[in-house]
């Protein structure tokens, strides 16, 4: 397997990665671990690993780790969507909750010191963009 260690200590894993010739070119591939092969397939399907995909995977994993870090430090999380957290709090507590959420989401984790983060909150009666 090919492993990419992330700053927070977790890994992105590409199972049974190997270089194989595809269309006359050496190509890095890995198993589609989240894919079930057809009953008559002789092996698990593979997918091509290329620079753009690897960069996207690292970027998304980093963003997900930041969001998980914020979720662990926040109470009253009603939902999360991509890079957003939504809290459900009484109206009278909304301003304080928004300020606290902004503080948590803009604080870089210990594994990413100095990372500039900006997370201005919105107070809404219903979730929206």
Residues of each region from the PLM?
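Conserved catalytic core of nucleotide polymerization and phosphodiester-bond processing enzymes
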Residues: 1-129
């Amino acid at each position: 397997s090919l492993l990419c260690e992330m700053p927070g200590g977790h890994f992105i894993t590409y199972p049974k990665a190997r270089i194989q010739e595809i269309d006359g070119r050496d190509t890095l591939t890995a198993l589609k671990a989240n894919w079930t092969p057809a009953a008559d397939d002789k092996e698990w399907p593979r997918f091509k690993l290329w620079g753009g995909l690897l960069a996207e995977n690292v970027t998304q994993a980093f963003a997900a780790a930041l969001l998980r870090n914020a979720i662990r430090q926040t109470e009253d999380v009603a939902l999360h969507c991509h890079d957003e957290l939504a809290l459900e709090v009484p109206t009278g507590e909304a301003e304080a909750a928004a300020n606290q959420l902004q503080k948590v989401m803009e604080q870089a984790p210990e594994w990413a010191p100095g990372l500039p983060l900006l997370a201005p909150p919105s107070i809404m009666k219903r979730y929206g963009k």
